[in-house]
Structures are given as C-alpha cells and as structure tokens.
Amino acid sequence: MEPIKNLPRLCRTLGYEFKNIDLLTQALTHRSAANKHNERLEFLGDSILSIVISDALYHQFPKATEGDLSRMRATLVRGDTLTLIAKAFKLGDYLFLGPGELKSGGFRRESILADAVEAIIGAIYLDSDLEVCRKLLLHWYAERLAEIQPGVNQKDAKTLLQEYLQGLKKPLPDYQVINIEGDAHDQTFTVECRIDDLSESVIGVASSRRKAEQIAAAQVLELLKK
C-alpha cells in the first residue's frame, strides 16, 4: 500500500490541509512498515485529544461531578469510538502497513485504526497549534458531544442498540463470528451484526469477539439514527 497516494483527498475528509504532508504520511505509517512510524505521534495525539475533550466536557456540564466527567471522557476517547471515527474517514484505505499486517487484515484492526486517529491528531498539532486542533476535534466530535449526558454508567454500544430496538418493539440483533485470523496470541475477529431493519449486515473487526461486537453495534446504531 502506497502511503502517499490520495492524501489530498484524505486532507479534505479530515478538514485540514497539511503544510508538511510528511507528518500525515508518518501518522499513517505503522511500525511494521518503516522505522519512522506513527507511535510518537500517537503518544502526542492521545494527550491532545484528552485535554480538548476534558475542556469541552468541563464547560458543557458545569454541574457534573469529577466522576461523571471522567466517565464521559472515557466514552469519547476509548478505542471503539476512535475506530468509528477512523472508519468514517476511511483511514484503512490510506494506512502504510508491513507485509505481515497487510496479510492479516491490519487495515481493519481496531487498535491500528484507533492509533492512527491519535497519530493524525498529533501530526495536525505539530503542523499547526493547539487551537487549530481544538476547533477540528470539536467538529469531529460535535454529534457525540451533543448526545452524551452525565450518568453513573456510560452504556456500551451493544446495550444502547438493544435498548433502542426494544423501545421500538423490534427483534434483538444477531451477532455471528464469521472469521478469525492470526496466531492465538494475536488474533483478529470479524463479527457480523444483523437486524431486521437493515437489508445488509454490518461488520466489526477487532482483537477480541467482544470488541468486534461493540464496533458492529455502534455502526448499526449510527445507521439507524441517520
């Protein structure tokens, strides 16, 4: 996979034009592909995402407790949320992976996709500044920030989908593992989620069956709410 191909199109999708396009290339480069990979950018992006979301929640919910703020932040920055953002950006089409990761479907793996989102955030920060990152992230997260509410528990996607369907008196979703790849210590699970209201199934890919089910459920929820 050629890392530089179609990067202008990705920039348009992200809503940011890089001055130094090499930073974006590095953000999309997995450690299996090159020595100059995205892990340091990922470290930086993780911190920037945390401060931007923390600040947004602090001002959005002036009466929320520290515990509620922490739980909401965890929901917004966790891996399955970042994976959904990556899928919306079609990041898998742009990742630069080594032969082994390509063969095992690394461009679908939730950890690689989530890490790439954080690395892109780090790259944008280095290419601009914190305020530019803040505005962009608030745009990426606008819908999620509008929907999230304080509470004792931030329910996971499977629970939310089940409650949504039950509220409409619809049959519950059916989850099936359709593929398992990789060695026992490094497996990738592909799970299919089917519901009556969608003509086609939705696929989730992750390092565990549970995570793959959560990713599939989250995608179904997004489709149902469109």
From Swiss-Prot:
Its cofactor is Mg(2+). It is found in: Cytoplasm. Residues 156-226 form the DRBM domain. CDD domains: DSRM_RNAse_III_family, RIBOc. One of its GO terms (biological process) is tRNA processing. Residues 7-129 form the RNase III domain. The keyword RNA-binding applies. The active site is at 46, 118. Mg(2+) binds at residues 42, 115, 118. Pfam families: dsrm, Ribonucleas_3_3. PANTHER family: RIBONUCLEASE 3, RIBONUCLEASE III. Belongs to the ribonuclease III family. Digests double-stranded RNA. Involved in the processing of primary rRNA transcript to yield the immediate precursors to the large and small rRNAs (23S and 16S). Processes some mRNAs, and tRNAs when they are encoded in the rRNA operon. Processes pre-crRNA and tracrRNA of type II CRISPR loci if present in the organism. This is Ribonuclease 3.
